[in-house]
Regions:
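Short, surface-exposed "cap/lid" segments of acyl-processing enzymes
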Residues: 84-189
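The feature captures the conserved acid-bearing segment of alpha/beta-hydrolase catalytic domains
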Residues: 269-401
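Long C-terminal extensions of eukaryotic subunits of large macromolecular complexes
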Residues: 1-36, 352-423
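Intrinsically disordered, low-complexity domain-flanking/linker segments in eukaryotic proteins
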Residues: 148-170, 189-215, 240-243, 297-307, ...
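Short glycine-enriched nucleophile-adjacent loop
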Residues: 258-270
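Gly/Ala-rich beta-loop-alpha elbow adjacent to hydrolase catalytic centers
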Residues: 249-261
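Basic, amphipathic N-terminal segments that precede the first structured/catalytic domain
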Residues: 1-100
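Alpha/beta-hydrolase active-site loop
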Residues: 134-137, 141, 176-243
């Protein structure tokens, strides 16, 4: 039997977290392109061995994280550690908060996907559409009402900006939760995602990944559901300290992040109903007949369940139907109603993204912010209920996908007779 000695094993590949050394640069359009071929995006597959590909991707992602976090800080955002009593060297998860959080009348909270780093919508969008477009930078600029920098200035300041953070004058604050970086890397003393954990340096290229133990768990943030609860209970519930007593909260939930928020609010809606203004979901994963009811089996949960239905105007289900909406993958133009209200308990709209679920937020965030403004301006706002069905066209000719007939009404009462939309 042949045995390889450790010194004879392939060394683990190492790539620098530097765009130029990786062979890439930021264009005038804020996109990441190859230096050798300015028309080519990031090339993931550079070797038949997947370990080389993963190591290079993690180095690129580290560059992007540095740039995005630098730009967020330039806009007056800072990091907050959870648990709140954790020191920088103790296990904690960082979230981003705007500097006006304690004084703002409105707070927009974003719960992202567990597969993404904080502040990143999708790495594929960052490379192809632009760093700001694929991250929370554009959203922060819009919500905090900051004057946007031109791409050239941001490029000169990346990856580390020497510019002073802009002063936030808006009465709307922003919180970027961190449902992805929930693994504590003891050696690096930082929280990382599962993808980053798998890309950590190893003794050789053929060694297995490190085994996780209890030391890699973050107290109160062991998974994305716990992290969502931690943001609500440690940050948003800190009335008079971290947020204003009368602050209204808008929630953006992306995939599992939205599912966690829905489950938490459904389990304790009576406590949070005075403060939640509206909910907007990207790629919703909850089901109205399951997740809109509390998932605990104690007496309080049973009492919530009795009142948490659409027939009760004070229930969470009624609130989500009236002041909630979702954006999903669809071939339809952005903003067109699509089927989904029966599954998710709220109106569903096309996001403008046809293929990738992770790209929905980057495509639909502007619509979300505009809708939040509309709902905030009208305390009595109530969404029309869109019943979208697909029917055959007249004469037996059926276009590809059929024809969608959208009925808009309140309390299942049709108020417009239906609008036909070719799909």
């Amino acid at each position: 039997m042949f045995v390889f000695r450790p010194k004879d094993l392939l060394p683990d590949p190492v790539y620098p977290a530097d765009l130029k050394e990786l062979g890439y640069f930021i264009t005038d359009n804020d996109q990441i392109k190859k230096i050798s071929d300015p028309e080519q995006d990031f090339q993931f597959k550079i070797n038949r061995n997947p370990r080389w590909n993963e190591a290079q991707r993690e180095a690129m992602n580290a560059c992007i994280r540095t740039i995005v976090h630098s730009r967020l800080r330039d806009q007056g955002m800072t990091t907050l550690r959870l648990p709140l009593n954790a020191s920088p060297k103790e296990p904690h998860v960082p979230i981003f908060i705007s500097s006006n959080l304690s004084t703002a009348k409105r707070v927009v909270v974003v719960f992202g996907e567990p597969i993404q780093d904080v502040g990143i919508w999708a790495y594929r969008s960052v490379g192809m559409q632009g760093i700001n477009a694929g991250s929370a930078v554009s959203l922060a600029q819009e919500i905090l009402h900051l004057q946007k920098k031109d791409d050239q200035q941001q490029q000169q300041q990346a990856p580390e900006s020497n510019g002073k953070p802009q002063h936030v004058t808006s009465d709307t604050a922003l919180i970027l939760a961190n449902t992805g970086q929930l693994i504590w890397h003891c050696g690096g003393r930082r929280a990382i995602t599962h993808a980053s954990w798998m890309a950590l340096p190893r003794r050789s290229a053929v060694d297995p990944p490190y085994t996780m133990t209890g030391r890699n768990s973050i107290p109160g943030n062991a998974n994305w559901q716990e992290h969502v609860e931690s943001v609500f209970e440690e940050v948003l519930a800190a009335k008079g300290r971290l947020v204003r007593e009368d602050a209204k909260i808008d929630i953006i939930g992306i995939s599992e992040g939205g599912l966690g928020a829905i489950r938490y609010l459904a389990s304790d809606w009576s406590s949070w109903s005075p403060y939640i203004n509206a909910i907007c979901l990207a790629s919703p994963l909850h089901f109205a007949n399951i997740d809109l009811n509390p998932y605990d089996n104690d007496n309080e949960a049973e009492a919530e369940t009795e009142t948490n239905n659409q027939n009760n105007p004070n229930s969470f289900a009624s609130f989500l139907l009236a002041r909630g909406r979702a954006y999903v993958v669809s071939p339809e133009p952005r903003g067109v109603p699509v089927p989904g209200i029966e599954d998710h308990g709220c109106n569903c709209f096309a996001s403008g993204e046809e293929l990738n679920i992770e790209c929905v937020m980057g495509a639909a965030w502007k619509e979300m912010v505009q809708w939040f403004e509309k709902v905030h301006a009208d305390p009595e706002y109530c969404e029309d209920q869109y019943d979208v069905t697909t029917v055959e066209a007249e004469g037996g000719v059926v276009p590809e996908g059929g024809v969608q007939v959208v009925h808009a009404g309140v309390d299942n009462e049709d108020d417009n007779g239906g609008v036909a939309i070719e799909v």
